[in-house]
């Protein structure tokens, strides 16, 4: 019986199929952190800091969302401050506009 070249390649192939790995995936970053800098002007409702947990606490005129995001309750200037020895807070102080 005669075997043609194509069948010979099929018969004598020696590489096995590729297996799967347990690793090899990653999740995208969550874009957490400061969205406004100290001394920057901000409008009411703007996000100041995105975080998980209360790394930075809300100060004057700053609200906290359900996912611990800090946002401005009034328009003004952002100020990052120390709250005791080991805590930080962010406040928004209103600015009187020049007329």
From Swiss-Prot:
InterPro entries: Ribosomal_bL27, Ribosomal_bL27_CS. Residues 1-12 form a propeptide. The gene is rpmA. Keywords: Ribonucleoprotein, Ribosomal protein. GO terms for cellular component: cytosolic large ribosomal subunit. It comes from the Bacteria. One of its GO terms (biological process) is translation. SUPFAM superfamilies: Ribosomal L27 protein-like. This is Large ribosomal subunit protein bL27. Belongs to the bacterial ribosomal protein bL27 family. One of its GO terms (molecular function) is structural constituent of ribosome. Residues 15-36 are annotated as: Disordered. The N-terminus is cleaved by ribosomal processing cysteine protease Prp. The keyword Ribosomal protein applies.
């Amino acid at each position: 019986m005669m075997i043609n070249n194509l069948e010979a390649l099929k018969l004598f192939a020696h590489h096995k199929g590729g297996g799967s790995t347990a690793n090899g995936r990653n999740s995208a970053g969550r874009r957490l952190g400061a969205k406004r800098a100290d001394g920057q002007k901000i409008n009411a409702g703007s996000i100041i800091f995105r975080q998980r947990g209360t790394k930075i606490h809300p100060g004057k005129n700053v609200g906290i969302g359900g996912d611990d995001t800090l946002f401005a309750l009034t328009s003004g200037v952002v100020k990052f401050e120390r709250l005791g020895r080991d805590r930080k807070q962010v406040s928004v102080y209103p600015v009187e506009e020049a007329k």
